[in-house]
Amino acid sequence: MNSHSHQTVRAETSRRDFLARSAAAFSGTLLCGGIGRAGEPLGYRIELTTAREGFDRKTGKACWAQSRAGIIPPGVPGNPGDRPLCLITTQPLLLSGSDVYTCVHEMRSDDLGRTWTPPKRCPTLARRIVSDDVEVALCDFTPTWHAATGRLLGTGQTAWYLNNRLMPNRTRETGYSVRDPQTGEWSPWKTLELPDVPRFKSAGAGCTQRVDLANGEILLPVYFKPVKDRCYSATVLRCRFDGQELLYVEHGDELKHDVPRGFCEPSLTRFDDRFFLTIRNDVTGHVTSGPDGLHFEKPRPWTFDDGTDLGSYNTQQHWVTHSDGLYLVYTRRDVRYDHIFRHRAPLWIARVDPQRLCVIRSTERVIVPQRGTRLGNFGVAQVGPTETWVVTTEWMQPAGVERYGSANRIYVAKIHWNRPNRPA
């Protein structure tokens, strides 16, 4: 796998220049996102960039997958500069099987994603050998800044392998790791201790978006089930984090749906003092909201504002949250893309009506285009007041997807807002 960029080049502009550029970058097309509180239409411009690319099926046994950004703000330990330090975590996916992951890697950019270092292996986030034929990996990793402790905390889940294949009737734990601000190294990954009850024997935070509260507590969505059951349920954990250890305090409503595999990969956000949860399901994605991030209304299927089905199924959706507008990033059915596995490309973005809990069809746009393969495992990160990123990877399964132009690109879709995103 060849890096798209082999060196990180330090830009000469300052953080002030970055903010000015973001605010003035609207000579391109503005996409209407609703009327903000000050009466000015909220808009944004999409800048699609590539952090790395390159794939050769003849020699490649793996492709990069599960790429997500983590942002360390300026002027904090580990980033004394005047611009955000941007990271991408990603990990090799073996093409010989299904969801067979190895060690998490890290890429860095100190020039706001103009250039990136090649993926570097993080030994502390590697697989662990349990026995001669059993190994366990940390996967589905999402790094997110925890302001109260000044640490980048990554959360995900474990995957257990028997002879390098997913183990049947396996457990699933919520895994996490903390990046040391002085050394830049990730701590050896740990698992979150949950109540010792059967339904939490398979409980993970893979691919989920969390919310950090002002007091430093964390609302972490997970999905769970007894090991031998078929259907998952979703809930939100309230956790404490001291900069090193993540501790369970309580969990909220247990949301259930008896449709194949139930509710998976929930993602949480907060907008206008209310919490919103989007949830994966095999048949159709669901959405709900609640007052405190723990208790929710009955989830309902995602629809457009005209009442028709959104068509997002069997993969994750994530939130893009601006203080003046709530957006959803998702995949959905479209006859133009029947050649793509589970219609997991392109990635769409649209504004959400937070009262009606629906997607406003007229605001829908493609944020990452399709090139014949899936993009459905992705993440969202706020880079600064006027910039938000959506990061995803071209997943090089099944064989032959490259004939449509896919090349295992790690995309960074930069959303440039025309108005600053105010802190919650």
What are these model-predicted stretches?
Residues 11-20, 26-39:
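N-terminal twin-arginine translocation
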Residues 7-9, 21, 34-36, 49, ...:
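N-terminal cationic amphipathic segment used for targeting or macromolecule association
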